[in-house]
Amino acid sequence: MRPSKRAAQDLRPVTLERNVARYAEGSCLVKFGGTHVLCTASLEDKPPPWLRGQGRGWVTAEYAMLPRATHTRTRRESMSGKPSGRTQEIQRLIGRSLRAVTNLPALGERQITLDCDVLQADGGTRTAAITGAWVALHDCCKWMHGRSIIKEFPLREHVAAVSCGIYQGEAVLDLDYEEDSVAQTDANFVMTGGGALVEVQASAEGAVFSEDELSVLLALAKGGIAQLVNIQKLAIG
């Protein structure tokens, strides 16, 4: 039995609240159960220096956790001078996931930065961030398109992400911290609305896992991401 009493294939309650940041071109407060992430999209009217003159734009991401997002206070990474390896890995993952469904030439020579700040962490912060950041990016693109800054809407399709794992010998979807901290296998899946894979991260924590078990996790993720995409569609109207 899962601590939350959920069935193996059940997501936590998920909400996507748009337009929560007054000044950002797009914003979304995403909640996966007790994990809450604020995602904002900011438009810059220039691309990164290495992309100038190439006629296309860029989508990138930054990720951070507030000091009391966790049970005990965590020192701000900005105080140490640079982001941790974990933070760099997550923000690169978010950026890759969003670029996978974005027509970058349609942006022109512009950059959109997604800032994903974890307000409260209860497992699955990176998957929640990707799912919410897509909504913020969508609204930023809509803002640009509505003002004729761009001629073509640049988002090709949805992208969302979810965690899966093997907890007490059972494959389960969308682990919270209590499950994740003792899971035998931990995996994150990023997929498009059409069901194509963007990224798969899977690690043996307490015991190795088989190809068959990975297939079960993938099937759970497909079902979960289909639900998340439907929630995104309802959120954007």
From Swiss-Prot:
Sites binding phosphate sit at R86, G124, T125, R126
Keyword Membrane part of the UniProt annotation: no
Q: Which UniProt keywords apply?
A: Nucleotidyltransferase, RNA-binding, rRNA processing, Transferase, tRNA processing, tRNA-binding
Q: Which reaction is this enzyme known to catalyze?
A: tRNA(n+1) + phosphate = tRNA(n) + a ribonucleoside 5'-diphosphate
Could you name the domain of life of the organism this protein comes from?
A: Bacteria
Q: Which CDD domains match?
A: RNase_PH_bact (cd11362)
Single GO molecular function: 3'-5'-RNA exonuclease activity
EC annotation from Swiss-Prot or TrEMBL: 2.7.7.56
Name a biological process GO annotation.
tRNA processing
Protein's UniProt keywords contain Glycosyltransferase: no
As for family, the record states: Belongs to the RNase PH family.
Quaternary context: Homohexameric ring arranged as a trimer of dimers.
PANTHER family the UniProt entry points to: EXOSOME COMPLEX COMPONENT, EXOSOME COMPLEX COMPONENT RRP41
Q: What does this protein do?
A: Phosphorolytic 3'-5' exoribonuclease that plays an important role in tRNA 3'-end maturation. Removes nucleotide residues following the 3'-CCA terminus of tRNAs; can also add nucleotides to the ends of RNA molecules by using nucleoside diphosphates as substrates, but this may not be physiologically important. Probably plays a role in initiation of 16S rRNA degradation (leading to ribosome degradation) during starvation.
Kindly provide the name given to this protein in its UniProt entry.
Ribonuclease PH
Species of provenance: Beijerinckia indica subsp. indica (strain ATCC 9039 / DSM 1715 / NCIMB 8712)
